[in-house]
Amino acid sequence: MSGGLAPSKSTVYVSNLPFSLTNNDLYRIFSKYGKVVKVTIMKDKDTRKSKGVAFILFLDKDSAQNCTRAINNKQLFGRVIKASIAIDNGRAAEFIRRRNYFDKSKCYECGESGHLSYACPKNMLGEREPPKKKEKKKKKKAPEPEEEIEEVEESEDEGEDPALDSLSQAIAFQQAKIEEEQKKWKPSSGVPSTSDDSRRPRIKKSTYFSDEEELSD
């Protein structure tokens, strides 16, 4: 099969089912005809009791067709059931969507705590082995080339003057530049300057010893 699941062609509509059958019961009954992807029993919205109608989504349309031919008009627990390929009502995408039930403290079937639906006492056909959880594969990050790693390490020293090979030289060099800039932009009197000089950028002492000063507004 190509193109993924096709609910409009691989979903079997089954009616006149015994009301006592659970999702797990139907899963076990219909799995003999092919890979069952999802079982949906129609229930009363108030009482949550089965209406005797269910949709069985198979992995492929051949399994669905084999199922309808095998069980249509056949007896199941004393009831003659009807089976046919379900008619698409435009809600196929919603039907196929996986639903996650995060509350694992209660059984989905009966609402009682202490067990999950796979082991619910209401399952007429007994317990069903839970499906194996798929392991999430962690995407491995491609290792960066060694050349790039070396460049990153070297980039930490970008902007420094090669002549400043010691910390004391760097401090002296930086301080001299700061004093020189302060003299250049220092106003001649104590009166605040209203000229364009007041709007010129001032040099702020950098905490990082390099030949790149930080400008303050």
Swiss-Prot record:
Induction data: Up-regulated by morphine. Down-regulated at 30-36 degrees Celsius while it is up-regulated at 39 degrees Celsius.
GO biological process, any: mRNA splicing, via spliceosome
ZnF (CCHC-type) ranges: 105-122
Domain RRM: 10-88
RNA-binding in keyword set: yes
Acidic residues: bias regions: 145-163
Disulfide bonds: none
UniProt GO molecular function: RNA binding; zinc ion binding
SUPFAM superfamilies in alphabetical order: Retrovirus zinc finger-like domains, RNA-binding domain, RBD
Organism lineage: Eukaryota, Metazoa, Chordata, Craniata, Vertebrata
Modification type Phosphoserine: residues: S155, S210, S216
Coiled-coil regions listed: none
GO cellular component annotations of the record: cytosol; nucleoplasm; U12-type spliceosomal complex
Subcellular localization(s) per the UniProt record: Nucleus, Nucleoplasm
Protein name: Zinc finger CCHC-type and RNA-binding motif-containing protein 1
CDD domains (alphabetical): RRM_ZCRB1
Keywords: Metal-binding, mRNA processing, mRNA splicing, Nucleus, Phosphoprotein, RNA-binding, Spliceosome, Zinc, Zinc-finger
Keyword Zinc-finger in annotation: yes
UniProt cross-references to InterPro entries, sorted A to Z: Nucleotide-bd_a/b_plait_sf, RBD_domain_sf, RRM_dom, RRM_dom_euk, ZCRB1, ZCRB1_RRM, Znf_CCHC, Znf_CCHC_sf
Region described as Disordered: spans on this chain: 120-217
Quaternary assembly: Component of the U11/U12 snRNPs that are part of the U12-type spliceosome.
Gene3D superfamilies: 3.30.70.330, Zinc finger, CCHC-type
